[in-house]
Amino acid sequence: MPLTPADVHNVAFSKPPIGKRGYNEDEVDAFLDLVENELTQLIEENSDLRQRIEELDHELAAGGGTGAGPVIAVQPTQALSTFEPELVSAKQAPVAAVAETAEELAMKATRVLSLAQDTADQLTSTAKVESDKMLADARVNADQILGEARLTAEATVAEAQQRADAMLADAQTRSEVQSRQAQEKADALQAEAERKHSEIMGAISQQRTVLEGRLEQLRTFEREYRTRLKTYLESQLEELGQRGSAAPVDSNADAGGFDQFNRGNN
């Protein structure tokens, strides 16, 4: 199917899948291939037309007619198919009518050249419009993707900040609770230690008082014992002095007196 300006003008590309930018690459490539093929065919048909006109000029020159010089024409496929029968009939016409036919063909070829130029301009303009549209759509898509990426990044950062703040607040709360509990435990241990220390010191003080009392009793007993012993010994010495050195000493009496001394001290 030949390509027409209407086909180029009315062609529509589908939107790309999610995640792609611009039009669908396969469709764009296929369309460009089609344009390339049609333009190649147009050039080839142009060359055929040029060759046929040159052949017609040679026939006119060989027949002695006065025709127009060679004419180069450029036209689309539709125009070539329209004038091709006239070129064939011109070869079969009499020499007298060939000049008129060549002149008409030259005029028609000029119109075809103008039409080809207009078609080329229209194709160029359409391609530029499509290119601008594709570029604009690509920019819009890029801006949209960039905006979505920016929003996603901002949302991610905000969510991460919220989580970090929540974790920090939770950590601070736990730290305060643990610190308070540790302080309470330390206070309790200190209070218990102070209580036990007070109890121990009280018991030690009480025992010290008892020991000091007993020590004082022992000291008193020692003083009294020494005093009684001294008194007893003095009395014995005095008694011995009175009896004289000749009289025997009654050991039983002395032992009984010493026992009496001990009983008195006890």
Curated annotation (Swiss-Prot):
Changes after translation: Phosphorylated by PknA.
Cellular component GO terms, alphabetical: cytoplasm
Superkingdom per UniProt: Bacteria
Phosphothreonine: residues carrying this PTM: 77
Regions crossing the membrane: none
Organism expressing this protein natively: Mycobacterium leprae (strain TN)
Assembly notes: Forms homooligomers.
Compartments where found: Cytoplasm
GO biological process entries: cell division; regulation of cell shape
UniProt name for this protein: Cell wall synthesis protein Wag31
Keyword terms, alphabetized: Cell cycle, Cell division, Cell shape, Coiled coil, Cytoplasm, Phosphoprotein
Keyword 4Fe-4S included in the entry's annotation: no
Region (Disordered): 239-266
Protein family (similarity comment): Belongs to the DivIVA family.
Xref: InterPro entries: DivIVA_domain (IPR019933), DivIVA_fam (IPR007793)
Residues forming coiled coils: 31-64, 152-203
Purpose: Important for maintaining cell shape and cell wall integrity by localizing peptidoglycan synthesis to the cell poles.
Pfam families per the UniProt record, alphabetical: DivIVA
NCBIfam families in UniProt: DivI1A_domain
Keyword Phosphoprotein included in the entry's annotation: yes
Gene that produces this protein: wag31
